Amino acid sequence: SLGLVGSEMCIRDRELHSVKVTAKNAPTLFAGCPIVCEAFDEPDQKALLVETLLATCPDTTIVSGSGMAGMGSANTIRTRKALERLYLCGDGCTDVATEGSLASPRVGVCAGHQANMILRLILGETEP
């Protein structure tokens, strides 16, 4: 629990920014963040953030949601380590464009996977 206490303090010390995240400002906005939880709705925004942080913030690990649209089984949502510093949570294939919409139960399951992976990373566990 000592790791969590230190991380909570770190989170409280962060500044809030009300800005649009761009490739230009993302490295500054997320500088010094050991873990970033990506939760954008739009695929292009997700890609921009993930690609920018992987390229410019070598000490940052990203936990991203991908594939949670529709009313399919929540049991298809999982967490996988895609790259050394990138974890993907979701089913990896469903999309709002094909499924029509997001459903809050599947979004909640995916968010739970993201939160769990982030806690595991804080505790030093790197495998999903």
Question: What is the predicted function of each stretch?
Answer:
Residues 1-6, 10-11:
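Single conserved hydrophobic/aromatic residue that forms the stacking wall/gate
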Residues 12, 23, 126:
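A Rossmann-like FAD-binding core segment of flavoenzymes
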Residues 14-16:
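Hydrophobic/aromatic anchor residues within beta-strands of the central parallel beta-sheet
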Residues 18-26:
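Conserved SAM/SAH-binding loop
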Residues 29-35, 39-128:
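Glycine-rich phosphate/adenylate-binding loop
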